[in-house]
A protein has these predicted regions:
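Cleavable N-terminal signal peptides of Sec/SRP-targeted secreted and luminal proteins
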Residues: 2-16, 316-329
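Beta-strand-rich N-terminal accessory domains
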Residues: 13-74, 78-81, 224-246, 292-302
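Acidic/His-leaning functional-site neighborhoods
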Residues: 24, 40-41, 79, 84, ...
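Short, well-ordered beta-strand segments enriched in hydrophobic/aromatic residues
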Residues: 26-28, 120-122, 129-137
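Extended, loop-rich substrate-binding clefts of extracytoplasmic carbohydrate-active enzymes
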Residues: 77-126
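Acidic (Asp/Glu-rich), glycine- and aromatic
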Residues: 135-164
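Active-site/ligand-binding surface loops and adjacent short beta/alpha elements
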Residues: 153-156, 160-243
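C-terminal GPI-anchoring signal of eukaryotic secretory precursors
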Residues: 304-318
């Protein structure tokens, strides 16, 4: 059985959309077209957006990560674009129960001089969620340049040091791009030299997640053979993350006892330390011809975790569904 409805929280002026496919339930919001909840068989899998990090699954557009000095040069003019772009902080237009669009406007053009439409859609089928991004260059004459990526955070008590990420294939040639942690204009940028990714992996497949795993920010992998990774928490695979349409996989969490891990599919990267600041020179920048579209997606397959919390969460979901239906009646 598949159905959907809208819940209006008037006191917060935020509209949420809930989609249900048998045992998998997701909630999204128009602000950032962001996921706010993923429940499978009554258990929450998405970070709550409260402790340590106030986001949950932001869209990275039209840049991924940091720009050198926080700005870039496009067609001879300097533009300031915030870390991970501006889309995650803008309100999208809802165009369907599970679809949103952000269109270029005066605010976006002041930061990014391209005309575009960014579509975000969520599809659920059985125990799998697919997140789809479609970018359309709406200009008739000019090629559009942009980067894009995802940043979902999944519940995982990695600080207990019982968690790991397993690559689907043996990774013989995988590389890691270190994040530069030296204070100054190059802070948070990609280092020019890569590291053998095998130094991070056990038996060519296992990335053990420890308390100090993210002391140097994200672990950014490139030249990945696997199409998917598994997130294992306390001896159980909780999800399978498929990102084969992207060039990089960033893995990150906040320092401390943060109860989540982010799996970040990136098409492009932050600026490198030796960046020229020219947007057109960014590594793997997407060049989209006039009136053309670029579609890219990733998917998450969820596995049932039976221990603890399920009954309460299912009752809570049933109450939420009842409230939503009552609101619709009025």
């Amino acid at each position: 059985m598949k159905f959907s409805f809208q819940v209006f929280l008037f006191f917060a002026y935020i509209k949420f959309v809930i989609l249900v496919e048998e045992d998998l339930v997701i909630t999204t919001k128009a602000l950032g077209a962001e996921l706010t909840s993923i429940k499978y068989k009554g258990r929450e899998y998405l970070h709550d957006g409260k402790s340590f990090w106030d986001k949950q699954s932001p869209i990275l557009f039209p840049t991924v990560g940091r720009l050198r000095n926080g700005k870039t040069k496009i067609n001879g003019k300097d533009y300031e674009i915030p870390m991970h772009g501006f889309a995650n902080n803008m309100t999208f237009q809802e165009i369907g129960k599970n679809s949103y669009v952000l269109k270029s406007n005066e605010e976006t053009l002041s930061q990014f001089p391209f005309q575009f439409e960014l579509y975000v859609s969520y599809l659920i089928e059985k125990n799998t969620l697919t997140v789809n991004y479609t970018v359309k260059n709406t200009n008739d004459t000019e090629t559009m340049l942009f980067g894009i990526g995802g940043h979902p955070g999944f519940k995982c008590d990695y600080y207990k040091e019982k968690s790991f990420i397993e690559f689907e294939e043996d990774e013989d040639n995988i590389k890691v791009i270190p994040v530069n942690m030296t204070n100054g204009p190059s802070y948070g940028l990609m280092s020019n030299e890569t590291i053998d990714g095998g130094e991070f992996l056990k038996n060519k497949k296992i990335l053990e997640i420890k308390k100090n795993s993210f002391e140097n920010d994200a672990i950014v992998f490139k030249d990945i053979q696997s199409k998917s990774v598994f997130l294992n928490d306390d001896g159980k695979n909780i999800l399978k993350f498929t990102f084969d349409q992207f060039n990089y996989l960033g893995i990150w969490s906040a320092q401390g006892n943060a109860p989540y891990v982010c799996l970040e599919p990136w098409y492009t990267t932050p600026d490198y330390v030796n960046s020229t600041n020219e947007f057109k020179d960014k590594k793997d920048i997407i060049k989209l011809e006039p009136n053309k579209t670029k579609e890219i997606s990733f998917s998450v397959e969820f596995f049932e975790i039976k221990n603890g919390g399920g009954i309460f969460q299912i009752k809570s979901l049933s109450l939420l569904l009842l409230i939503g239906n009552l609101i619709i009646l009025f």
